[in-house]
Amino acid sequence: MKVLWAALVVTLLAGCWADVQPEPELERELEPKVQQELEPEAGWQTGQPWEAALARFWDYLRWVQTLSDQVQEGVLNTQVTQELTALMDETMKEVKAYKAELDEQLGPMTSETQARVAKELQAAQARLRSDMEDVRNRLTQYRGELQAMLGQSSEELRARFASHMRKLRKRVLRDAEDLQRRLAVYKAGVREGAERSVSSIRERLWPLLEQARERNAKVGALATQPLLERADALGQQLRGQLEEMSSRARGHLEEMREQIQEVRVKMEEQADQIRQKAEAFQARLKSWFEPLLEDMQRQWDGLVEKVQAAVATIPTSKPVEEP
């Protein structure tokens, strides 16, 4: 923007020093009409950021159109196209941000309605962007034609360009108003869905609130009773709980006593079984080794008898006398 204003000032100063001739009568007659065509629509509202961005887009274009031929020749370059593209992108960005803000603040609608409205909004955004691109392309075309007619009369070209701009402006305003209406419908539908959700939540929470109110009423009634009565009721409740715990403890002790008795009986039975098995095993061992011992005793006795008999049969030798 600073570059454009600098070019405007330099061109105006150059025109003053060159003693430029006054504009033709036809151009002076067309200028009020062009100014009237470029005035904003009375019914157009700029309450939302995207609407303000669209207004800035048209303000910039109106400023370009109100310049003289010499100034337009100096400023209608690629930078103007870039500025218009930036303003167009800003408008589309603000539209998306506004829709996202509605979704975040008011909550989603039903899936079917949300899909249908989202599709309609996308189509309206696409039409508005297409119209703004047509404006930018028409401005680029006008710049080329203006450069081609350098040094010639451009009243007819300016009149034709103003007519095209008027038609394009009507298209842009029509599609912008359509987008406004659809966003308003979307906002109303989202609010209605949020109200239905709140009503559903209220219906679900109402019984819980009634129960809480009843409990609070009971607690309040208890709080109004005398302290002695409440203490007596609490003592009876504690006494009942202690008696219940005592009976449970006695029951557990009886069960433990019975279990210990059963264990003692089982241990005595197992000890008797072990004793009987030991006696049986001892008897079996005795039955195994007694015949063997008796046989060994007989063999030993026989061996002793044989040794004694052999010793008895050996003759005793006489002692040898010395000469």
Curated annotation (Swiss-Prot):
<feature type="region of interest" description="Specificity for association with VLDL">
    <location>
        <begin position="284"/>
        <end position="296"/>
    </location>
</feature>
<feature type="modified residue" description="Methionine sulfoxide">
    <location>
        <position position="149"/>
    </location>
</feature>
<dbReference type="GO" id="GO:0048018">
    <property type="term" value="F:receptor ligand activity"/>
</dbReference>
<dbReference type="GO" id="GO:0098978">
    <property type="term" value="C:glutamatergic synapse"/>
</dbReference>
<dbReference type="GO" id="GO:0010976">
    <property type="term" value="P:positive regulation of neuron projection development"/>
</dbReference>
<dbReference type="GO" id="GO:0010977">
    <property type="term" value="P:negative regulation of neuron projection development"/>
</dbReference>
<keyword id="KW-0850">VLDL</keyword>
<protein>
    <recommendedName>
        <fullName>Apolipoprotein E</fullName>
    </recommendedName>
</protein>
<keyword id="KW-0597">Phosphoprotein</keyword>
<dbReference type="GO" id="GO:0033344">
    <property type="term" value="P:cholesterol efflux"/>
</dbReference>
<dbReference type="GO" id="GO:1905907">
    <property type="term" value="P:negative regulation of amyloid fibril formation"/>
</dbReference>
<dbReference type="GO" id="GO:0008201">
    <property type="term" value="F:heparin binding"/>
</dbReference>
<dbReference type="GO" id="GO:0034380">
    <property type="term" value="P:high-density lipoprotein particle assembly"/>
</dbReference>
<dbReference type="GO" id="GO:0010544">
    <property type="term" value="P:negative regulation of platelet activation"/>
</dbReference>
<dbReference type="GO" id="GO:1900223">
    <property type="term" value="P:positive regulation of amyloid-beta clearance"/>
</dbReference>
<dbReference type="GO" id="GO:0006979">
    <property type="term" value="P:response to oxidative stress"/>
</dbReference>
<dbReference type="GO" id="GO:0097487">
    <property type="term" value="C:multivesicular body, internal vesicle"/>
</dbReference>
<dbReference type="GO" id="GO:0070328">
    <property type="term" value="P:triglyceride homeostasis"/>
</dbReference>
<dbReference type="GO" id="GO:0006641">
    <property type="term" value="P:triglyceride metabolic process"/>
</dbReference>
<dbReference type="GO" id="GO:0042158">
    <property type="term" value="P:lipoprotein biosynthetic process"/>
</dbReference>
<dbReference type="GO" id="GO:0051044">
    <property type="term" value="P:positive regulation of membrane protein ectodomain proteolysis"/>
</dbReference>
<keyword id="KW-0162">Chylomicron</keyword>
<dbReference type="InterPro" id="IPR000074">
    <property type="entry name" value="ApoA_E"/>
</dbReference>
<dbReference type="GO" id="GO:0042803">
    <property type="term" value="F:protein homodimerization activity"/>
</dbReference>
<feature type="repeat" description="8">
    <location>
        <begin position="240"/>
        <end position="261"/>
    </location>
</feature>
<dbReference type="GO" id="GO:0050709">
    <property type="term" value="P:negative regulation of protein secretion"/>
</dbReference>
<dbReference type="GO" id="GO:0042470">
    <property type="term" value="C:melanosome"/>
</dbReference>
<dbReference type="GO" id="GO:0044794">
    <property type="term" value="P:positive regulation by host of viral process"/>
</dbReference>
<dbReference type="GO" id="GO:2000822">
    <property type="term" value="P:regulation of behavioral fear response"/>
</dbReference>
<feature type="repeat" description="3">
    <location>
        <begin position="130"/>
        <end position="151"/>
    </location>
</feature>
<dbReference type="GO" id="GO:0034362">
    <property type="term" value="C:low-density lipoprotein particle"/>
</dbReference>
<dbReference type="GO" id="GO:1902995">
    <property type="term" value="P:positive regulation of phospholipid efflux"/>
</dbReference>
<dbReference type="GO" id="GO:0042311">
    <property type="term" value="P:vasodilation"/>
</dbReference>
<dbReference type="GO" id="GO:0042159">
    <property type="term" value="P:lipoprotein catabolic process"/>
</dbReference>
<dbReference type="GO" id="GO:0071402">
    <property type="term" value="P:cellular response to lipoprotein particle stimulus"/>
</dbReference>
<feature type="signal peptide">
    <location>
        <begin position="1"/>
        <end position="18"/>
    </location>
</feature>
<dbReference type="GO" id="GO:0070374">
    <property type="term" value="P:positive regulation of ERK1 and ERK2 cascade"/>
</dbReference>
<feature type="binding site">
    <location>
        <begin position="235"/>
        <end position="242"/>
    </location>
    <ligand>
        <name>heparin</name>
    </ligand>
</feature>
<dbReference type="InterPro" id="IPR050163">
    <property type="entry name" value="Apolipoprotein_A1/A4/E"/>
</dbReference>
<dbReference type="GO" id="GO:0033700">
    <property type="term" value="P:phospholipid efflux"/>
</dbReference>
<dbReference type="GO" id="GO:0005543">
    <property type="term" value="F:phospholipid binding"/>
</dbReference>
<dbReference type="GO" id="GO:0034364">
    <property type="term" value="C:high-density lipoprotein particle"/>
</dbReference>
